[in-house]
Structure formats: C-alpha cells, structure tokens
A protein has these predicted regions:
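Sec-dependent signal peptide recognition
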Residues: 2-9
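Hydrophobic h-region of N-terminal signal peptides that target proteins for export
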Residues: 10-17
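Amphipathic alpha-helical repeat scaffolds
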Residues: 24, 28-32
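A short gly/proline-enriched turn/hairpin at secondary-structure junctions
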Residues: 45, 49-61, 73-77
Length: 160
C-alpha cells in the first residue's frame, strides 16, 4: 500500500484534517519536552526574534531572554504535568494558534518571573496561549492564566 493511501486512511479514522493531525503531533512533542524540561528542544521551536508575553507584565524578546525564562521556570518546579485540552489554528503552515492547556507542577523554588511566593505547593492551572507563527516556528506567544486562582491554591487570602 502506498504511503499516501496509508496517510489518507489514518486521517479518515483519526477524524481530523491534515493540519490538525500535524499540529496535534507537535503539541504532543511539546508536552513531552515540557515534562522532560528539555530547554534545547523548546528553543528550537522559536524564531530568533521570538517575543513571549506572560501575565503580570513580563515580556521576553529574543531567544536569549526566552531561554532564561524557561530555565528559571524549570528550576522552580518539579513533577510537571501538562496537557493540551483544545486548539484552533489559522492557515497552513499555521499563522495563528489558540491553545487551551492545563498545567500541574510542584513549586520547589521562587521563580524570578512570578511576583508571588508559592513554594511548597502544587499548582494546578488552566490557561490559554495565543501563538503567532512564522513558517513552522513560533514568533510570538501571549500567555493567559488566572493568577488569583494560583495564589488561592498556595494559601493566599484575597481581601478587598
């Protein structure tokens, strides 16, 4: 059986389009890299002039700054479990990707790029990444999560 016929059969049984199938594979690889704390693999997915924005006003420009963010994050958490819940893309190769994700990790040290101390807790959050691509690389990521929920899990009391 030819490879093309085999791919068509796989896509039909998978119930998704070719781009969705390819994106899901890339997201699976990204989950594996996050859980393995593989900074080099993650950095290979970015353009040289990547911009990454986090809640609370943190903005990283270029691979060097983004690498520092990932290294700091991986030094501050253990037992990472991440899951891509859903996504939608635009274009092929994808010019835009909206990703809904779930993250769980044990916080073992204070992160440089998070304003609050949550050391000693296990944080479970859901968030959203808006990703803009350039070819098959990521050029910009804007991340959203609920900081208030994270702080409440860490035992902070929120008052007016």
């Amino acid at each position: 059986m030819s490879k093309i016929k085999l791919l068509m059969i796989v896509f039909l049984f998978a119930g998704c389009s070719v781009p969705d199938f390819m994106i899901q594979g890339q997201l699976d690889d990204f989950e594996i890299a996050l859980e393995a704390e593989d900074v080099n693999w993650i950095m290979d997915q970015y353009t040289d002039d990547v911009v990454r924005e986090l809640p609370d006003g943190f903005k990283f420009k270029g691979k060097d700054e983004v690498r520092m963010y990932w290294e700091d994050l991986f030094q501050s958490v253990d037992n990472i479990d991440v899951e891509a819940i859903d996504f939608v893309t635009s274009g092929f190769p994808p010019a835009k990707l909206a990703l809904h994700w779930r993250w769980k990790a044990d916080v073992v040290a204070k992160a440089k790029y998070f304003k609050f101390d949550t050391v000693g807790t296990t944080i479970k959050i859901e968030g959203m990444d808006l990703t803009y691509g350039s070819g098959f690389k990521t050029a910009r990521v804007i991340t959203f999560w609920n900081t208030l929920d994270m702080l409440q899990q860490a035992g902070y009391k929120v008052t007016k």
